[in-house]
A protein has these predicted regions:
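Core SAM-dependent methyltransferase catalytic element
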Residues: 214, 220-242
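C-terminal alpha-helical "lid/dimerization" subdomain adjacent to the S-adenosyl-L-methionine
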Residues: 17-18, 88, 161-216, 220, ...
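Class I SAM-dependent methyltransferase SAM/SAH-binding core
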Residues: 60-118
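Conserved alpha-helix/loop element of class I SAM-dependent methyltransferases that forms part
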Residues: 29-32, 39-59, 74
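A short acidic, Gly/Pro-enriched loop at the edge of an enzyme's catalytic core
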Residues: 117-128
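N-terminal auxiliary segments of SAM/dcSAM-dependent transferases
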Residues: 1-20
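A short glycine-rich, Lys/Arg-flanked "PGG" loop and its adjoining helix->strand segment in the class I
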Residues: 142-154
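Hydrophobic beta-strand segment of the Class I
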Residues: 30, 129-130
Length: 242
C-alpha cells in the first residue's frame, strides 16, 4: 500500500486529522514508550543527527513534527538564537511546552500548532530544519517536503531522522518480529490506543527509504543529500541541502 494511504484509524477523516487524533491520544505516554521501545538508543540517534549541523552554526532552526520536543531540545546544544517547533497535535505540544517551562527556555524556544504541509512562514526564513520521525506521517509527502524547501534558506540544511528497514540477518528478522508483533501489544496496553502502535510498523513498511527517498528530496528542490544508516539499518539520518 502507498505511504499516503496508511492511516492510524479506519475512518473517513483525512490522514493528517487521524494522525493528530492519534498523537493527542498517546501524548501522555509518548516519551516513555519512545525510550522504552528503543532502549534509549533514540537519544543517541538524535545526538548524531544534530551533530550534522554542528559546523553550520544555524541561528534560526525550525523543528517540524516537533511532538514533545526531544529533537528541538537536542538542537539547543548548537546554541541557536531561536528554535521554533511546529506540530499538528495539540496534546503533544502541551507536553513539549511544559518541558520548555521546566528548562527556562521560553526566550529561545516556541512551539506552535500547525500543518507541516502548509507552513505559516516566509520563504527562506530558517537556517536549518529538523524532523524526527515525522515525515512518515505527512499526508502528502512531496507537498510537505516542498514546504520545508520553501522556508529553508538557500544553502541551509534539512536533517531528517526516520525509521528504515534493515536488510541483513539477523537484525532484519529480529526487527520485523519486534516491530510487528511485540511493540503493538505493549503499545496498546500502555497507551490505551489500540491502533497507534499498529500504525507505526505499517507506516514504516510503506515509507520510501534510502535512494528512493533521496530522489524525492531532489525532486522537490534539494540539490544534494546523503543517507546515514543507524544501528544496522533500523533508522536513517538524511542530510539534504537547498
Amino acid at each position: 500500500m502507498e505511504h499516503d494511504k496508511i492511516t492510524p484509524y479506519k475512518s473517513d477523516a483525512e490522514k493528517k486529522e487521524q494522525v493528530a487524533e492519534m498523537f493527542d491520544n498517546i501524548s501522555g505516554k509518548y516519551d516513555f514508550l519512545n525510550h522504552f521501545f528503543s532502549a534509549g538508543i533514540d537519544n543517541l540517534w538524535r545526538k548524531k543527527a544534530i551533530k550534522e549541523l554542528a559546523k553550520d552554526n544555524p541561528k534560526i532552526i525550525l523543528d517540524v513534527a516537533t511532538g514533545t520536543g526531544d529533537f528541538a531540545f537536542e538542537a539547543m546544544k548548537l546554541n541557536p538564537e531561536k528554535i521554533i517547533g511546529v506540530d499538528i497535535s495539540a496534546g503533544m505540544l502541551e507536553v513539549g511546552r511544559k518541558k520548555i517551562e521546566k528548562r527556562s527556555l521560553n526566550d529561545k524556544m516556541e512551539f506552535l500548532l500547525g500543518d507541516s504541509e502548509e507552513l505559516d512562514f516566509d520563504d527562506e526564513k530558517f537556517d536549518a530544519i529538523t524532523v524526527s520521525f515525522g515525515v512518515r506521517n505527512f499526508q502528502d509527502l512531496k507537498k510537505g517536503l516542498s514546504e520545508l524547501n520553501r522556508v529553508l534558506r538557500t544553502g541551509g540544511k534539512l536533517i531528517i531522522l526516520e525509521f528504515s528497514k534493515p536488510k541483513r540477518f539477523p537484525v532484519k528478522q529480529a526487527y520485523f518480529t519486534y516491530f510487528k508483533y511485540i511493540m503493538p501489544v505493549i503499545g496498546k496496553v500502555v497507551s490505551r490506543d489500540k491502533s497507534a502502535y499498529n500504525y507505526l510498523p505499517q507506516s514504516v513498511m510503506a515509507f520510501p527509504e534510502g535512494k528512493e527517498f533521496q530522489e524525492i528530496l531532489k525532486e522537490v528542490g534539494f540539490s544534494q543529500s546523503k543517507a546515514i544508516p543507524l544501528t544496522g539499518g533500523i533508522a536513517s539520518i538524511y542530510v539534504a541541502q537547498k
